[in-house]
């Protein structure tokens, strides 16, 4: 597969949350915008975490058992965040995230600033587009 930059397939407009955003407000936003998660920023715009639908579901189910549902994004977000550059090769990124078992969208950073996000569907689109244009792989076969 040819080299494809992250910047060619990333989403430029990124929905973000702050740590003090109400959890159910964040869930409502994710459902409304049909996104699976979003980066969490501090007041200076630095990425301090990421909130995924999986984080929400896991924590809410656990919290409902103890009758402690609710809270803020900061209570539920994942603080270990994998970030990538717009110039990174998507195939290398895909290889890296599958080896690490990373299942969240990946913030794309340029000079310390959030410039986009790359999701699993974005990566799958690369594979689909490559297959469609070259006739190679299952998509292009008769």
Question: Which residues does each predicted region cover?
Answer:
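A generic helix-loop boundary/linker signal
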Residues: 16, 20, 46, 66-67, ...
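Charged, low-complexity, helix/coiled-coil-prone segments
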Residues: 32-43, 58, 66-70
